[in-house]
Amino acid sequence: MYQKFQISGKIVKTLGLKMKVLIAVSFGSLLFILSYSNNFNNKLLDATTKVDIKETEKPVDKLIGGLLTADFDEGSCLSRYHKYFLYRKPSPYKPSEYLVSKLRSYEMLHKRCGPDTEYYKEAIEKLSRDDASESNGECRYIVWVAGYGLGNRLLTLASVFLYALLTERIILVDNRKDVSDLLCEPFPGTSWLLPLDFPMLNYTYAWGYNKEYPRCYGTMSEKHSINSTSIPPHLYMHNLHDSRDSDKLFVCQKDQSLIDKVPWLIVQANVYFVPSLWFNPTFQTELVKLFPQKETVFHHLARYLFHPTNEVWDMVTDYYHAHLSKADERLGIQIRVFGKPDGRFKHVIDQVISCTQREKLLPEFATPEESKVNISKTPKLKSVLVASLYPEFSGNLTNMFSKRPSSTGEIVEVYQPSGERVQQTDKKSHDQKALAEMYLLSLTDNIVTSARSTFGYVSYSLGGLKPWLLYQPTNFTTPNPPCVRSKSMEPCYLTPPSHGCEADWGTNSGKILPFVRHCEDLIYGGLKLYDEF
């Protein structure tokens, strides 16, 4: 091969000067092309991260304190190892050594029992039996059934995975929706996607999982139709907003002693049920070791599990570098309007302005005298990222700050990536934009979110941010006070059980444990993990 590129000295001497130059240029170009080709993948990775000189000076911890494994090809999922570079500061919350060890053990278990393995095929065969009392087999599974909006899905995925981690089950994800278009595979050398030929997701049962389903655990428990002598091959766990306490308290010790023997669990959920796991003393012992800082549960699990696909990550990096990267400070504002607003947005805008100015997140508007005094050659730039279905919010904020100077002399620029007016769950492009915006919000320095919004919960917890929560308006009026600063970055379990397990049966669920208390953004109910007592 090398000889094909040699040119004898005799031939070169007979050539004219122009030909010599042409050959030299051609040969140099060839070497450049070969060099470029060999390094193309590396250059692609560098271009995607778009890291500036200041960012590269930060100590590199792509594995986030061991939370991530190095057993993946970077190019297949750029966000996995490159998210770190977009965050202005590394997260102060470090994963425990016990959590890191537990995740590595889980990865080996998933690889041994995942789809297309002999253990998986053996477990599938047992689904057709009427009774599973004879043997559990080596591998047990929990199937997450997709439903509801993206925020709900991510919260429930993290909840189900933590339950799988505690009970040594294999999590398999229903992929009939758009999971694979949004997220990369989280476990090396295997897949978390449930094969489409899984028998319990056929047309008959696809939308038949509800409280009336014959093997719904909550219903069977109420009817006393399940016991340790007759173990079904699968159970359906109903953990939605309309669940009964008999559904929600499947986490209790006495329930787990029976459920633990069932090979297959199928879960449909739209709530973040992690706080209730702490009601089980066995789980609590393990959870304390996994998460010494209790408010970091979703923060760590989300950074481990959720890695946007390259298509989604392109949206994040492009928008970030175009609008947010040069700002001195970034503020995220996520606004969810429940019900039909019918064009009535003024009370919401008033609430956002009242909250952000009262909490010094946005500057006050300057008086005529102040506008003359606060003249700076290098004014501070504050970028405000608005995430909402309605473009009116960013439009109103833009008009306010473009027409009236700020009292501090700061320049306030407002951006809103999308405003589609209608939530279009399961539409690929809509869900991809939603995921991109969650990540963009997580990159801000401070964040304000709407009460009861799972979109907001994911965003601030992913970024390790304690949010300002906007109280839900009533009768189209601005609440007073407009917002409250949360003492925890954990999401809220919006519809928890009313009481605790066994010994705590008669106790309000928000008063059982000092670190599991009611949420700040709900008048009644809701459970949340706190480190501050």
Curated annotation (Swiss-Prot):
Residues 1-13 are cytoplasmic. May be involved in cell wall biosynthesis. May act as a fucosyltransferase. It comes from the Eukaryota. It is a single-pass type II membrane protein. This is Probable fucosyltransferase 5. GO terms for cellular component: Golgi cisterna membrane. Expressed in roots, leaves, flowers and siliques. GO terms for biological process: cell wall biogenesis; cell wall organization; protein glycosylation. Pfam families: XG_FTase. Residues 35-533 are lumenal. Pathway: Protein modification; protein glycosylation. Its EC number is 2.4.1.-. The gene is FUT5. GO terms for molecular function: fucosyltransferase activity; galactoside 2-alpha-L-fucosyltransferase activity. Belongs to the glycosyltransferase 37 family. Glycans are attached at residues 202, 227, 374, 396, 475. Its main location: Golgi. Keywords: Cell wall biogenesis/degradation, Glycoprotein, Glycosyltransferase, Golgi apparatus, Membrane, Signal-anchor, Transferase, Transmembrane, Transmembrane helix. It is found in: Golgi apparatus, Golgi stack membrane.
